[in-house]
């Protein structure tokens, strides 16, 4: 590796603000903020809006947005066209 061209790899404190959960993860992210963690050490700090602790897919709180499949919706929408064509023949 060439010296001086790679970012510093260090332990960073990530905070999921939606779930109020902290993660200590090795990262190269650049941040000016720092925060003291529960272990008494000060780490670089990054606030997150969503993480695995608050995302609906990972928490099991995912809501089903479609009540029926795309094919069933298509058939329901165009069912009257098929019956009208048969009656005309």
Swiss-Prot record:
InterPro entries reported in the protein's UniProt record: Ribosomal_bL28/bL31-like_sf (IPR034704), Ribosomal_bL31 (IPR002150), Ribosomal_bL31_B (IPR027493), Ribosomal_bL31_sf (IPR042105)
Listed Pfam families: Ribosomal_L31
Keywords carried by this UniProt record: Ribonucleoprotein, Ribosomal protein
Coiled coil: none
GO molecular function: structural constituent of ribosome
Gene3D superfamilies: Ribosomal protein L31
Keyword Methyltransferase assigned: no
A GO CC annotation given for this chain: ribosome
Signal peptide bounds: none
GO annotation, biological process: translation
Record-linked PANTHER family: 50S RIBOSOMAL PROTEIN L31, CHLOROPLASTIC (PTHR33280), LARGE RIBOSOMAL SUBUNIT PROTEIN BL31C (PTHR33280:SF1)
Summary of subunit composition and partner proteins: Part of the 50S ribosomal subunit.
Family from the record: Belongs to the bacterial ribosomal protein bL31 family. Type B subfamily.
Protein name: Large ribosomal subunit protein bL31B
Source organism (scientific name): Pseudomonas fluorescens (strain ATCC BAA-477 / NRRL B-23932 / Pf-5)
């Amino acid at each position: 590796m060439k010296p001086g061209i790679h970012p510093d790899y260090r332990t960073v404190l990530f905070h999921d603000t939606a779930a109020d959960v902290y993660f200590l993860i090795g990262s190269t992210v650049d941040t000016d903020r720092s925060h003291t963690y529960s272990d008494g050490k000060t780490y670089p700090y990054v606030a997150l809006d969503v993480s695995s602790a608050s995302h609906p897919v990972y928490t099991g709180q995912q809501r089903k947005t479609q009540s029926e499949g795309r094919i069933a919706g298509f058939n329901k929408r165009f069912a009257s066209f098929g019956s009208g064509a048969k009656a005309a023949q």
